[in-house]
């Protein structure tokens, strides 16, 4: 997947120098990376940054239900990292639980999880399940509204705990 992205960027950029801005503008964003950015912004207490990333995703071609699924996956991974931290387990254990061979990914998750309290992540997992089903159960809100409401409530939980 990387080679076609590099070729696309090189094909659109005039000259021989590719800037960070060129990559941001032209490269396909990976939903997992966007979800990680949103949760990282919440961990940093940068709620405006998390909301801006969500607005960017919703303005693009991302489906709200897909966004919610990826955020849910990310929050569950952060929860696993927090449990590993609380139980004194190391990176190798976290890699095994997450099913990844990337030590870097496990470390990044552990670093972000350390910024959250266990109650905030526990509530985050519960909220993910609640908001993934909310539009279908009640019909009172749209998928996009559910994702926005989830992000607000998760940020409030993180701030409170």
Residue ranges: model-predicted function:
Residues 15-121, 158-159:
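Small-residue-rich helix-loop
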Residues 1-37, 133-138, 142, 153-161:
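Non-catalytic interfacial helical region
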Residues 2, 68, 121, 144-147:
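Hydrophobic packing residues in well-ordered alpha-helices of helical domains and bundles
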Residues 88-90, 141-146:
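Long amphipathic alpha-helical segments
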Residues 68, 72-75, 125, 129, ...:
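Generic structural concept
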Residues 108-140:
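C-terminal capping/gating helix-and-loop segments adjacent to ligand/active sites or protein-protein/ligand interfaces
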């Amino acid at each position: 997947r990387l080679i076609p992205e590099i070729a696309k960027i090189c094909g659109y950029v005039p000259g021989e120098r590719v800037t960070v801005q060129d990559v941001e503008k032209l490269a396909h964003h990976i939903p997992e990376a966007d979800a990680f950015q949103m949760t990282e912004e919440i961990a940093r207490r940068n709620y405006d940054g998390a909301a801006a990333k969500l607005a960017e995703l919703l303005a693009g071609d991302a489906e709200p239900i897909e966004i919610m699924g990826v955020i849910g996956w990310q929050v569950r991974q952060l929860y696993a990292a927090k449990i590993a931290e609380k139980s004194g387990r190391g990176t190798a254990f976290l890699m095994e639980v997450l099913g990844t061979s990337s030590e870097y990914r496990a470390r990044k998750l552990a670093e972000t999880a350390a910024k959250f309290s266990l109650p905030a992540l526990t509530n985050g997992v519960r909220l993910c399940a609640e908001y993934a089903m909310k539009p279908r159960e009640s019909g009172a809100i749209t998928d996009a509204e559910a994702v926005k409401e989830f992000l607000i409530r998760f940020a409030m939980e993180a701030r409170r705990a």
